[in-house]
């Protein structure tokens, strides 16, 4: 059988060949010129790199075990390190330098005390609740992420089982993830309310949503395409919806905006 991977901890000192990047001034005084930021959803176990509000990269990650969950909150990258040395959290005299035996891989992106984003020599653990609270990434992924972020890059860690996406073609879709930490119950009414914010709640049937919550498999559910409606220069609160090649208009809202007498035949 394969031995369990050693538990990670922040390297207390860099290896001889390590390259370390630390802030030259307080984090609040630094400007993030690229406007890049990191979002980590513990429920989906996905790390997203944003530029402004645009998603530019998404990576699967491993996060804290149920007994040692990754803390949620608002943070910032505090320091970065190439070729970190792993230090045994139970015996600091035990250390593993850079190389294939190092459980935190070849990159460390610290964002809060002992917590950081790092590589791993156990890629099979990615996607699970596996760590002492750090965020594990596949080595190729963390090396990719490392080049895009800098000290001061904002890091938001959160736990959302329901994720709603809007594609460039206006398609609204949602995902329901399992409650790995047991932190967040989810009801049909909550999903409906969230979809209402995108104007597509009427195209999501009660039973379909209930089935998705019961499955909690993280698979995508496409709802409808949503388009803004402008009448006489005014954007309506209701939206035009597209489904199966058909466009549906909110007739009452359009008639009211046009000051027409709407009659049903």
Language model region names:
Residues 2-28:
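Low-complexity, acidic Ser/Thr/Pro-rich repeat tracts that form intrinsically disordered stalk/linker regions
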Residues 43, 73, 141-145, 187, ...:
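Stable alpha-helical elements in mature extracytoplasmic
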Residues 19-22, 26, 33, 89-217:
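Exported/periplasmic cell-wall-interacting domains
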Residues 33-35, 42-45, 56-58, 72-74, ...:
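Extracytoplasmic
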Residues 38-45, 66-123, 222:
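Long, compositionally biased stretches
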Residues 208-265:
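Primary recognition of N-terminal secretory signal peptides and signal-anchoring hydrophobic helices
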Residues 53, 83, 161-164:
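Short, charged beta-turn/beta-strand-edge "cap" motif at the junction between a beta-strand
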Residues 24-66:
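A structural motif detector for short, solvent-exposed N-terminal "entry" segments of globular domains
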């Amino acid at each position: 059988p394969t031995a369990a991977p050693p538990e990670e901890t922040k390297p207390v000192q860099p290896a001889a060949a390590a390259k370390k990047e630390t802030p030259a001034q307080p984090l609040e005084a630094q400007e993030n010129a690229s406007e890049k930021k990191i979002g980590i959803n513990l429920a989906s176990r996905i790390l997203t790199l944003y530029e402004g509000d645009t998603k530019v990269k998404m990576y699967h990650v491993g996060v804290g075990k149920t007994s040692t969950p990754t803390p949620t909150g608002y943070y910032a990258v505090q320091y970065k390190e190439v070729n970190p040395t792993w230090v045994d959290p139970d015996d600091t005299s035990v250390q593993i330098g850079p190389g294939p035996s190092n459980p935190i891989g070849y990159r460390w992106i610290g964002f809060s005390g002992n917590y950081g984003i790092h590589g791993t020599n156990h890629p099979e653990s990615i996607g699970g609740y596996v760590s002492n609270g750090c965020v594990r990434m596949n080595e190729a992924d963390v090396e990719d992420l490392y080049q895009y972020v800098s000290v001061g890059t904002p890091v938001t860690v959160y736990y959302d089982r329901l994720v709603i996406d809007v594609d460039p073609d206006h398609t609204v879709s949602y995902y329901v993830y399992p409650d790995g930490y047991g932190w967040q119950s989810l009801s049909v009414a909550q999903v409906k309310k969230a979809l209402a914010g995108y104007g597509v709640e009427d195209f999501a049937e009660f039973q379909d949503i209930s089935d998705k919550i019961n499955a909690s498999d993280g698979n995508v559910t496409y709802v409808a395409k949503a388009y803004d409606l402008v009448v006489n220069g005014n954007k309506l609160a209701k939206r035009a919806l597209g489904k199966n090649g058909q466009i549906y208009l909110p007739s009452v809202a359009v008639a009211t905006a046009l000051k027409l007498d709407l009659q049903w035949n």
